[in-house]
Amino acid sequence: MANALIISAGNNANEYLARHIAELGYTRPAFAASGGEARRRMDAKDFEVIIINTPLPDEFGHELGMDAVQKTDAGVILLAKTATAEQISDKLQDYGVLVLGKPFTAAQFRQAVQMAAGIFRRLALVRAENAKLQDKLVQLRLVDRAKCFLIEKRGMTEAEAHRLIEKTAMDTRKSRGEVAEDILDAEV
């Protein structure tokens, strides 16, 4: 289920925002009435979309938007009066916060939510790819350490050590990293 956080001091605004994001699959959004409460909720749970309806009772909300972008993967939307939105838009857009001037139409709001959700999905893909590449780097380092071990302790050339690891991996149906780990563990 999609998770959204609505940060707003007004109940009428909460109902309006919740009704419109429900159309996009965010049927049970979490609510926070202040910046402090929102930060606690963001620390406790991951959200796809965070909507900040300014001003908040304890702060305006633009700092919260910047914090949310830096500390979470959520797409962040800041709702502000048009005059204020124009003033803070450039600074917040540099951080990746979507700024929507009030009043806005339901279609504009839904489009902003869809863009924020797209940002979240894109970041999730980038994080997954990053984790995959990090794992690959760990495996390569492990294989290189095993090769160095074979070269130093068994007098093999680099090509022979590489071939031994590759052949053992194919014969045992293990990854090269697992074979390298076995070689290093066996000789410790």
Where do the PLM segments sit?
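Conserved acidic segment of CheY-like receiver
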Residues: 1-12, 17-21, 50
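The C-terminal output helix
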Residues: 115-128
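C-terminal output/effector regions of signal-responsive regulators
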Residues: 131-188
